[in-house]
């Protein structure tokens, strides 16, 4: 039996998704699978799991999840996703809920218990299936204990001797930080409770444990890997990251162009390509009509924002400068939800500038596609951005971004006025700098249509493919001395 790369994740599109993590885990494993790498994914069986297009079946019943004090069982279901197995850990008391991590009251009180269980259940499933993986690849705090458990299992269990671990950090700010008493019930050995392990200012930090014990740690862009080594972006973990700097790598995410491409997008009223951009203008007119914007905006630039309405995404900067933008006779579309104060303010501005500003406090996948296609300029004023996917989508849709020069935004946007420019960036994450960059974009759109069309075509030619990212991960696995696909014992 060939040894697999097994991905551990709390989300995987199309089965579950709350943000970019789900998109990545819906694409990267599949890219490796299509490259001939034996690959599997393990994820929770949520109460609102979307399985209509991929029927699931019970594959393991009463899988015993070993805890020091008592065995707990779970059932495991399986789906065939384009020929790749996806396993779903089912235990109703932990995962049969409307939302993944929180509800309107806040984070679920038992999140630590839920995801400690998931990590242990994944390892129990691998034992039950009888074949140790070549690589266990965990993602974010929810699965960060997989590398930690593996580190200690390898010291005494021959089954795991040749398995290596990778932890990918999608957003360092979310760490899974819990009360110290929960460490005692996690099943990690006492020696893991140290300043170089799972302990963080007296708390149990799941992500820190993964960083400490994974064989390799990656982030989702090269720039973010460098940024988190310092206190400005390190979220308190820059110390442990500097200690593990030799194991830290930045690998840029890809974009799923099977889903996000204006030449084959089923959500668009008209498709278009770099050689035939007429359809983009038609998408713009259709979007203006759909959202009830003033028809004259068909002849003016429309600025689109898609993202969580939270401080990290810089929505407050956009709301601060929006009245000033209205003086330039532009349209603004905001799609997202998040902080209630930001939501209310965005809705108030829509009322104040009815017909020129549209705020949709929700997220729908189809409308996101139409905003990418129908906007002229895409706004992404993030205070930090580990990678970012929406700017990659904007580039492919010929909607040059205006973005902060941080993290993955720095790695994916060539800033104007370079002859190879694909968008606009600004250095200081503040309202004045953001406004200047937007006005530069509006000026170019208005006064130099030929230069603008050149930028649009260059943007659409960018190719941040998952195959490229997959090859980078295969190189990383090779550094660990493992070759997925080799026959196991």
Swiss-Prot record:
The keyword Transferase applies. GO terms for molecular function: alpha-1,4-glucan glucosyltransferase (ADP-glucose donor) activity; alpha-1,4-glucan glucosyltransferase (UDP-glucose donor) activity. InterPro entries: Glyco_trans_1 (IPR001296), GS/SS (IPR011835), Starch_synth_cat_dom (IPR013534). Its EC number is 2.4.1.21. It is an enzyme of class 2 (transferase). It catalyses: [(1->4)-alpha-D-glucosyl](n) + ADP-alpha-D-glucose = [(1->4)-alpha-D-glucosyl](n+1) + ADP + H(+). Pathway: Glycan biosynthesis; glycogen biosynthesis. ADP-alpha-D-glucose binds at residue 17. Synthesizes alpha-1,4-glucan chains using ADP-glucose. PANTHER family: ALPHA AMYLASE DOMAIN-CONTAINING PROTEIN, GRANULE-BOUND STARCH SYNTHASE 1, CHLOROPLASTIC/AMYLOPLASTIC. NCBIfam families: glgA, PRK00654.1-2. This is Glycogen synthase. It comes from Nitratidesulfovibrio vulgaris (strain DP4).
């Amino acid at each position: 039996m060939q040894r697999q790369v097994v991905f551990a994740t709390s989300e995987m599109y199309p089965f579950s998704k709350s943000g970019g993590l789900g998109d990545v885990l819906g694409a990267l494993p599949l890219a490796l699978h299509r490259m001939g790498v034996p690959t599997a994914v393990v994820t929770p069986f949520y109460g609102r799991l979307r399985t209509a297009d991929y029927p699931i079946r019970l594959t393991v019943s009463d899988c015993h999840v070993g805890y020091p004090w008592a065995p707990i069982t779970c059932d495991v279901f399986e789906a065939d996703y384009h020929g790749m197995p996806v396993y779903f850990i089912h235990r109703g008391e932990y995962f049969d809920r409307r939302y993944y991590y929180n509800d309107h009251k806040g984070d679920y009180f038992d999140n630590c218990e839920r995801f400690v269980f998931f990590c242990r259940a994944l390892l129990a499933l691998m034992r039950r299936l009888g074949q140790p993986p070549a690589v266990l690849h965990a993602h974010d705090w929810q699965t960060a204990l997989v590398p930690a458990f593996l580190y200690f299992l390898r010291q005494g269990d021959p089954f795991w001797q040749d398995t290596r671990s990778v932890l990918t950090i999608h957003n360092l700010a979310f760490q899974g930080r819990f009360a110290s008493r929960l460490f005692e019930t996690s099943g990690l050995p006492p020696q893991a409770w140290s300043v170089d392990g799972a302990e963080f200012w007296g708390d149990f930090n799941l992500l820190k444990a993964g960083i400490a014990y994974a064989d390799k740690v990656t982030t989702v862009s090269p720039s973010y890997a460098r940024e988190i080594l310092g206190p400005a972006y390190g979220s308190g973990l820059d110390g442990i990251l500097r200690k593990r700097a030799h194991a830290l790598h930045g690998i840029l995410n890809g974009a799923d162009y099977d889903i996000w491409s204006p030449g084959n997008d089923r959500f668009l009223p008209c498709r278009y390509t770099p050689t035939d951009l007429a359809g983009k203008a038609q998408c713009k007119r259709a979007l203006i009509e759909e959202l009830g914007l003033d028809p004259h905006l068909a002849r003016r630039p429309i600025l689109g924002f898609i993202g969580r309405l939270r401080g990290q995404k810089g929505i407050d900067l956009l709301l601060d400068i929006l009245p000033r933008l209205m003086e330039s006779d532009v349209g603004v579309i905001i799609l997202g939800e998040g902080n209630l104060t930001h939501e209310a303010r965005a809705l108030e501005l829509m009322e104040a500038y009815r017909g020129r500003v549209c705020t949709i406090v929700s997220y729908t996948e189809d409308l996101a596609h139409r905003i990418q296609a129908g906007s002229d300029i895409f706004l992404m004023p993030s205070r930090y951005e580990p990678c970012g996917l929406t700017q990659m989508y904007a580039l492919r849709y010929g909607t040059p971004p205006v973005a902060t020069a941080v993290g993955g935004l720095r790695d994916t946007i060539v800033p104007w006025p370079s002859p190879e420019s694909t968008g606009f960036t600004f250095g200081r994450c503040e309202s004045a700098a953001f406004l200047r960059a937007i006005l530069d974009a509006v000026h170019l759109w208005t006064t130099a249509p030929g230069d603008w069309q050149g930028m649009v075509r260059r943007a659409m030619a960018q190719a941040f493919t998952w195959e490229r990212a997959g090859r980078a991960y295969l190189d990383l696995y090779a550094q660990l001395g493992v070759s997925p696909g080799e026959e196991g014992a």
